[in-house]
Amino acid sequence: GWMVPLAFIGGYISADFASGLFHFLADNYGSTSKKFFGPVFIRPFREHHVDPLAITRHDFLEVNGVNCAMSVPILLATYALLPVGANLWTLMFAAYIGLFLFGIFLTNQFHSWAHMPNPPRIIRALHRSGLILAPDHHQKHHTPPFNTYYCITSGWLNPILARTRVWERVYE
């Protein structure tokens, strides 16, 4: 029935939240000089605010490599360890994890496309559909005071998190 599609949606929404939480933390905490985390995770987010179009000048591997290196091994291990007999809970778990990790893997790509001046027609259609982060939606993050709309997978959670002032409350 309806529970497996609901798990897919839940996984994708969770990826959107994870992207927002990570983006919020990278923008506001830590140092770019910290070993490993600084240059790999924090610096790209901070530099992105200086040159938002830079992400569009990187190749697929540079944009998505770190997220791929984190999500694909987890996905493979998860599916390798799933029991063979697929009951409803197993299917729901697989659907949730699959869409969560798919969203994490492609978050930076969706973010890049939101900054691309002239994306391909199919990407524009995905933007209009709301399935991936849309440029006009993401622009709110690049508007002073730069303290909202951190979710960059689909952006679905941004209005809710802004209305409830979640990031402001965490920062206080």
List each model region and its residues.
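Catalytic donor/gating beta->alpha subdomain of glycosyltransferases that bind UDP-sugars
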Residues: 26, 35-46
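Helix-coil boundary and interhelical linker segments in multi-pass alpha-helical membrane proteins
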Residues: 1-7, 79-95
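Cytosolic/stromal cytosol-facing helical appendages immediately following the last transmembrane segment
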Residues: 29, 33-37, 50-61, 85-92, ...
